[in-house]
Structure formats: C-alpha cells, structure tokens
From Swiss-Prot:
Signal sequence annotation: 1-25
Gene source species: Arabidopsis thaliana
Stated name of the protein: Putative serine carboxypeptidase-like 54
GO cellular component: extracellular region
Secreted as UniProt keyword: yes
Superkingdom classification of source: Eukaryota
UniProt xrefs under InterPro entries: AB_hydrolase_fold, Peptidase_S10, Ser_caboxypep_ser_AS
A GO MF label: serine-type carboxypeptidase activity
GO biological process: proteolysis
Lineage start: Eukaryota, Viridiplantae, Streptophyta, Embryophyta, Tracheophyta
Keywords assigned: Glycoprotein, Secreted, Signal
Compartments (UniProt record): Secreted
Sugar-bearing residue positions: N58, N59, N105
Keyword field contains Secreted: yes
Length: 190
C-alpha cells in the first residue's frame, strides 16, 4: 500500500489560505477604519512624519491615543496591539525624522533632542487634528515604552504650553503613560 506524503510548500499554501479566509470573513477586521500617510512639518525644509491611524472598534468618541516607541529610532508602526482599538482611536507615528517611514531630504531637518522632537510631534498633532476635527474634542493620551519615556513628558509639556498660548487647535490632554515593560505584558490581547 502506497503512503501519501505532502510537500512542505503545499502545507504552507494550505496554512496561508486558511488564515486568509478567516481574516477576510472576520467583520471586526474588514470594518476597521484605518489610514496611513505623511504630514509635512512647518519647521522643516523637507521632513515628513509617517503615521498609521486606526479608528476605535467601539466608538468614534473614544479617546485618542498616540503610541511612541522607544529607541531612539524605533518605528512605532510595528507595535499594533489590537486591545487598544477596543477602547481608543490609535495613532502610531514613526519618529523622530528618518525613523521607519518618516523621512527628510535635508540633514538640517534631523532632530537630536527631546525639545525638537516634541515640536515636530506637536506640529504633527496640529495637522492631524486639522484633518480630523471630530477627534480634536476627544480626550488625548500619550503613551509608549522604553526610550519614549524621554519623548512623552516633552510632548506632554509641549501640548500643555501650546494649549495655554492658544497656538492652534486645543488638544484635550489628559494623562500620559510610560510602560516600564512592553505593552504586550501591560495590555491583554483579548
């Protein structure tokens, strides 16, 4: 009696297609509002900050959370924790400039300190909330991990000062959080 064997490539294809069909059939995935893109920075010659935005799965009036990764120089785009989307609108920003998909063609646009990075992020937030005015009234939280612990307080201070001086759109800053461990351990994936 002959034995039937399957090749490894065949098994891989079967696994991939089984994952695709379950992903495409999941309404929580296909209904997920998201977009990505670049915002120009007014204090730069050619810098563009890349962002990835996901709408809350629950309610569009949920808080807005910006996630900043550590590094410095680690892309925020690789930290996609689905549990955040159950309770918030989530923004990932590749920062500082020349991190991830963010770029600049002029070396004078590179930032080397928290104040400059926080100015860029503040300008990014002004552009983001101008494009999404319905989110500007929602509570706003800054969170991240690792080296982002340097950027988070600087950005919170910058947002607070910008609000006090009425420099632009008022950002409804509430609380900041710096994870001492990775967010996988901090938030449940369920």
């Amino acid at each position: 009696m002959a034995t039937k064997t399957f090749s490894l490539p065949f098994l891989l294809i079967v696994c991939i297609f089984s994952q695709l069909s379950s992903t495409f059939g999941d309404p929580s995935v296909k209904d997920l509002g998201q977009h990505a893109g670049y915002f120009s920075l007014p204090r730069s010659k050619s810098a563009r900050l890349f962002h990835f935005f996901f709408q809350s799965r629950n309610n569009s009036s949920d808080p807005v959370v910006i996630w900043l990764s550590g590094g410095p120089g680690c892309s925020s785009s690789n930290q996609r924790y689905i549990s955040y989307l159950k309770i918030s609108n989530l923004i990932y920003v590749d920062q500082p400039i020349r991190t991830g998909f963010s770029y600049a063609n002029d070396s004078t646009d590179l930032r080397h300190d928290e104040d400059s990075v926080s100015n860029d992020l503040y300008d990014f937030l002004q552009a983001f909330f101008k494009e999404h005015p319905n989110l500007a009234k929602d509570d706003f939280y800054i969170t991240g991990e690792s080296y982002a612990g340097h950027y988070i307080p600087a950005l919170a201070s910058r947002v607070h000062n910008g609000n006090e001086k009425k420099e632009g759109i008022v950002i409804n800053l509430k609380v900041t959080d710096i994870s001492l461990v990775t967010a996988t351990a901090t938030w449940s994936a369920g």
